[in-house]
Amino acid sequence: MIELKGTYNQDCKIFIDEVETEAIELVRNILNQEISAGVQVRIMPDTHVGKGIVIGFTMPVTRMVNPNYIGVDIGCSVTTFKLNQRIEKERFPTLDHAIRRSIPMGMHIRKEKNLDDWWIIPYFETVNNNLHAFQQKWFQRFGETKGSIQVDKEYISRLCKKIGIKESTFYCSVGTLGGGNHFIELGESTKDGSHYLTIHSGSRHFGLKVCNYHAKKMHKTTVLPEEYHEEFKCITRDTLPTSDIPQKLEELNKRYHVGKREYMLEGEDMYEYLVDMVIAQTYAQFNHKAMAKAIFKDLGENYQAVDTVYSMHNFIDTTDWIIRKG
C-alpha cells in the first residue's frame, strides 16, 4: 500500500505497492487542492492514468466539485443478466447479427421514426424520485432548501438547449451502445455452464454535453485571491530595475498556479451540476434497460433473466456523497 500526503489532504491510500509515476502525480495534484481537504481519499488497486485523474479514484464530496473528475462518460455502468437457459452455439452468428441490427453502436443513434418511447414516462418518474432524494440530502448537508424540480418533456427541452444538444439526440440515444470500451458480451460460467449477458455503456452524448457545459463554467466561478492582486501591484510598482518585473511576475503566477489552477464549482454552480448529474446518471441506467429490452427480444420469448446485477462505476453518489471514478 502507498500512502500520500498533500497540502490539503493527509489521508490518501493507494491499495497497491507499485503505481506509475504519472498516476502518483495526478493524485498529488488533487491532494494539493482545497477540494480534498479533510476527507479520506482511497485509490483502488487497479488504478491507472486517466484524463486529468486516475481511474480507481474515490473520495467523499466536499463543498466543491470538479466535473472533470467524473468526466464525460457520466454514469458508465455494467449490467449482467443470468439467463434462464443456455444459448445454442449454432445461434451465435445469427444472434450477433440481430444485436448489431437492433443496437446502434459507435457514433450511431436511433432514427426518430423508429423511436421506441416506452421508457420515457418511467424515466421521468425515476429521475424525479432520485432528485427528490438528492434535494433532501442537500438540505441535510448544507442546510439549504431548494425549489422543487419536476423533470418532464418541457424540462428536458430547456436542459438540452442549455447544454447544447438536440432533443432528438437525447431521446434517440437511449438504447445505444456507443464506442470506446463499451461492449455487449455473452459469457459462460466456468462453474455450471450458465450463460450471462453483460452490457457496458453510459449516458452517451448527453453525458458528454453535461460535463462540458459545467467544466466551462469552472473558469468563471473562482477568482484569484486579493493577496495575489496586492503582490502584483507591488511588483509592477516597486521593482527596480524594471527588467526584473517579468521574472518576478512569473514566480508570482507559479506560486498561485495561474494558468494551471484547477477551478472548482461551488454553491449554486455545484448544485446545478449535481442536479444534471442525477439526470444523466438515471439516463445511463435507462439506456441499459432499453438495450436489454431489445436484446431479449432478439433472444426470443423463451429467454428471461433469472438474476440481474447493475453496477455504476463512474458517478457521484448524491445520497452518500461519494465520488467514484471508474
Predicted regions and their residues:
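Domain-length cofactor-binding catalytic modules of enzymes
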Residues: 2-29, 36-43, 49-59, 63-67, ...
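Active/ligand-binding-proximal structured segments within catalytic/core domains
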Residues: 70
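Mobile "lid/hinge" segments at catalytic clefts and subdomain interfaces of large enzymes
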Residues: 76-82, 207, 227
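Metal-associated gating/positioning segment near the N- to mid-region
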Residues: 78-94
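Short coil/turn segments at secondary-structure boundaries
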Residues: 110-115
